[in-house]
């Protein structure tokens, strides 16, 4: 087997003040790969023959003067633009809108905490509509008086159990809310109830990303041992859910994790009702609200584009006669 590649290119050379622009031309580049018989893979026993042929630097003719007229005012000091990077950084660093919506405060005498916020406060206002608000009201979810930013938003209730360990705090909780999604059948807005569990581990020591990520699969005898120590071992918690919580700090923001949980519940398989009839694929009518006549149309009994071929041929023969 042999492979021959030929190319020709021009490469610039360093230019001095007293010399014109020079270029180095690469005439040919031939690469031959041969494989002896008996080797199924040509990469085994390859003999390489590479030859390069260079020529002397080629001096190009002097370039003609450009006829483009450049105004001298373009290079004046008054035309320069001053960039104030400090002001720009202050404008860009506006923070996240969901920061501070759910704050855990250290308290040694409290083992259960209840929080209430809204989808709008978490930066998920596009998932909040009248449909989600009515569904949440039917579930018994209400916006408390502590939420002053969006009192009419869709409520998000968070229940947290606090488990204290040596230099650690584990927060096991559940998030309850309703988000607005599009029905997969008819396309109308529908409310999707959310009951999502989460666990956070607050440690006094800084959290570092592990070199080896454990997927949580155990085999053989290790599986039984892992089940016995499941309640006392926090290794199953993802390192992204482990937060640094120094002892001198009194509160920590967990709003981002709550927001991520709601994001994970967004699905494209939401259905407004199990008896939803969907929409007509031809005219787009919502079959839950009205009926269409697309199904009553008579189907073509011919043979596709050749169904009327006989009639067309008879008409042509009649015209000829």
UniProtKB/Swiss-Prot annotation:
Principal subcellular localisation of the protein: plastid
Summary of the knockout phenotype: Embryo lethal.
Organism: Arabidopsis thaliana
Record keywords: Chloroplast, Plastid, Ribosome biogenesis, Transit peptide
Keyword Transmembrane: no
This protein's name: Large ribosomal RNA subunit accumulation protein YCED homolog 1, chloroplastic
Lyase in keyword set: no
Known function: Plays a role in synthesis, processing and/or stability of 23S rRNA. Required for embryogenesis.
